[in-house]
Amino acid sequence: MKARVRRLLLVLAAAALLLDGGLLLAGRLGAASLPEEDTAYFLDVGEGDCTLLVSGGSTVLVDAGTPEGAPALVRELKSLGVRRLDAVIATHPHADHIGGMEEVLRAFPVRSFYMSAETQSDGLDAALRRRRLTPLVPYDGETLTLKGGASLTFLGPAEDIPADRVNDRSLITLFQTGSASVLLMGDAEEPAEQSLLRHHPELRCDILKVGHHGSDTSSSPAFLSALGAQTAIISCGTDNDYGHPAEQTLTNLTLAGVRDIRMTAESGTVALPLIAYKENAV
């Protein structure tokens, strides 16, 4: 009798181990993983801004939305397979762009942190100290090379933009892959657009992350015409208080030949695989 009980207990223990191992394996197999191919995610953070760039496993986060949306942002990043961030960029100090940074820094190991010279926040400073990160202010033309071969170049702000024009002193970044280029404008407005074209007259892009949530202070006709973008992404909240995007901005984009205009307020998070983008563009 005792022998039978011992055998039964051993069988039950073995079954429990197999079940536990199977669950663990299923958990590992079911975990999300980042794509190896170059991809741009324009995350839906309501009336805010956040973009995730992926290349060969390297990850760059540009802005982090609002404080209120930070927990949901962290959950979405984890659901996409983010486990660490190679670079985080704070374009400028407005809360709808850097409000979620503290939560992001708590949730993920971060290799490097870039910000505009004007970006200061006691909470953000404390979060950076906890991570033992020294914030870097990039220079115009500074380039980061990602594992997949893509590059991210900082464009401005130039010295001809006054320090008190916080939106126009946003860090502007150009993400370039073998197939496509993505220009992220932060909250830059028309003076910054003019400055950008003066200092980088050769600038072109396939995908434009529209400046200042589609406000009528950005996306001037001359700027859009020079860029030649085919796709435009506007990050804005549903029924927001600012009227974003402005009808004039949508008109300017259409007249400039932008064939694909997407708004996170309508589409949610927009994921754009960039491989062979030009061949597959609408």
Region spans (language model):
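Non-globular, low-confidence helical/coil segments that flank catalytic cores
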Residues: K2-V282
